[in-house]
């Protein structure tokens, strides 16, 4: 039994304009050095531009893009018999998958060579919405690794089913 008291799960409040938790998570990920107002400007300008280009609700486009990038499995390195094996497991928590998807989207934004973060984030979200781009490639790579290493899992068939449904 742990001596430390169990930490309560921190509740994330939705953002003030779009009233969406995933948008607020994006703002917190974009924020650097505590400059939250700048992060809000970047994200809101990005969503405004997405709404103008697609003629759809920008939050729905963003959440669909997030759903497209979100992985269904994860791989964890385990040491067995002197060698390190990547053992896949299914992601049951959507928050963990969302955090991974946001991280991948922002990493691929930083690799792009555009002038502003707004334009980079907009192109990456639209690419993820159309199921192309670097973040989607990263998800497919992870699912390929999980399918190849499914034999190391306790239930390999469940891993293969989760990966094949997505692909």
Curated annotation (Swiss-Prot):
GO cellular component, one term: chloroplast
Location (main, coarse): plastid
KW Ribonucleoprotein (keyword) present: yes
Transmembrane segments: none
Cell compartment(s), UniProt: Plastid, Chloroplast
Family the UniProt entry places it in: Belongs to the universal ribosomal protein uS7 family.
Domain of life from the UniProt record: Eukaryota
Keywords: Chloroplast, Plastid, Ribonucleoprotein, Ribosomal protein, RNA-binding, rRNA-binding
Functional description taken from the UniProt entry: One of the primary rRNA binding proteins, it binds directly to 16S rRNA where it nucleates assembly of the head domain of the 30S subunit.
Chain's gene name: rps7
CDD domains, alphabetized: uS7_Chloroplast
Subunit structure: Part of the 30S ribosomal subunit.
Name recorded for this polypeptide: Small ribosomal subunit protein uS7c
InterPro entries: Ribosomal_uS7, Ribosomal_uS7_bac/org-type, Ribosomal_uS7_dom, Ribosomal_uS7_dom_sf
Lineage, highest ranks first: Eukaryota, Viridiplantae, Chlorophyta, core chlorophytes, Chlorophyceae
HAMAP family reported in the protein's UniProt record: Ribosomal_uS7_B
Biological processes, Gene Ontology terms: translation
Pfam families named among the record's database cross-references: Ribosomal_S7
GO MF annotations, alphabetized: rRNA binding; structural constituent of ribosome
